[in-house]
Amino acid sequence: MSIHQTIKRITAAEIRSRKGQEPIVSLTAYQAYSARIADPYCDFLLVGDSVGMVVHGFETTLPVSLDMMILHGQAVMRGAKKALVVIDMPFGSYEESPEQAFSNASRILAETGCGAVKLEGGVYIAETIDFLCKRGIPVMGHIGLTPQAVNRFGGFKTQGRNESNWQQIEADAAAIEEAGAFAVVVEGVVEPLAVRLTEMLSIPTIGIGASSQCDGQILVMEDMLGYGTWVPKFVRRYGALEQEMEKAIKSYADDVKSRAFPSEAEIYKLKQKSG
């Protein structure tokens, strides 16, 4: 008789209940292998539209399609068994109307099995968040530096450097909470504003380039692992995998050229005839 142990996946409601408790741990993930490794240590994994820049080589997140997000979301769901999986709704998939957003968000949930979607924006997107939440789709918000608005911001610029700009970001946060979001990513804002948002909201704030006082933190996994040459100010490198990868590939290439690979132990031989 075999015993099958079912791993209980974290839900959006559980993330919401973590407000003010032990910090919430999160990373981005784009494929099954990295999701499987990160899963035991993360409360949620974000299939971010940053996949367009990190994996596909785009300069911004704007070219990312709904089909791309679903494909990567399916891969992450195969690798992650415990963490809540949240999938970004890409640029152009939700801004037109709440009905458009519901059509695309419901497709994401149905085709991937993920537990929530994430939308960028504040006051202007609150009606859409409300529409989705009332129809059973958990939504994570995203305010501050919103990469899909890179052209409006004139680049990836820190938000809230002048206190005169705080009022709009605070209004965005309040509107998202009132609309029913279970958590909100606070990206690229000055530390005092991130603390203020965390104190004023009853839902968890997930910081990226914000404050250690947020209710949780998220980083792009590849940034944290040490891929790429440009390191944003808010990223701490916990590895140097790009150098290790280059070193391993060079060693492989050298061994192939010198015929040191494959060795006798790494090739198949005929079976010895008996008798």
Swiss-Prot record:
Record: active site: 187
Biochemical pathway: Cofactor biosynthesis; (R)-pantothenate biosynthesis; (R)-pantoate from 3-methyl-2-oxobutanoate: step 1/2
This protein's record includes keyword Magnesium: yes
Required cofactor(s): Mg(2+)
Top enzyme class: transferase
Binding annotation for 3-methyl-2-oxobutanoate: 49-50, 88, 118
Disulfide linkage: none
Cell compartment(s), UniProt: Cytoplasm
Subunit structure: Homodecamer; pentamer of dimers.
PANTHER family for the chain: 3-METHYL-2-OXOBUTANOATE HYDROXYMETHYLTRANSFERASE
Role summary: Catalyzes the reversible reaction in which hydroxymethyl group from 5,10-methylenetetrahydrofolate is transferred onto alpha-ketoisovalerate to form ketopantoate.
Name of the protein in its database record: 3-methyl-2-oxobutanoate hydroxymethyltransferase
Organism of this sequence: Bartonella quintana (strain Toulouse) (Rochalimaea quintana)
Upper classification of the organism: Bacteria, Pseudomonadati, Pseudomonadota, Alphaproteobacteria, Hyphomicrobiales
Name of the coding gene: panB
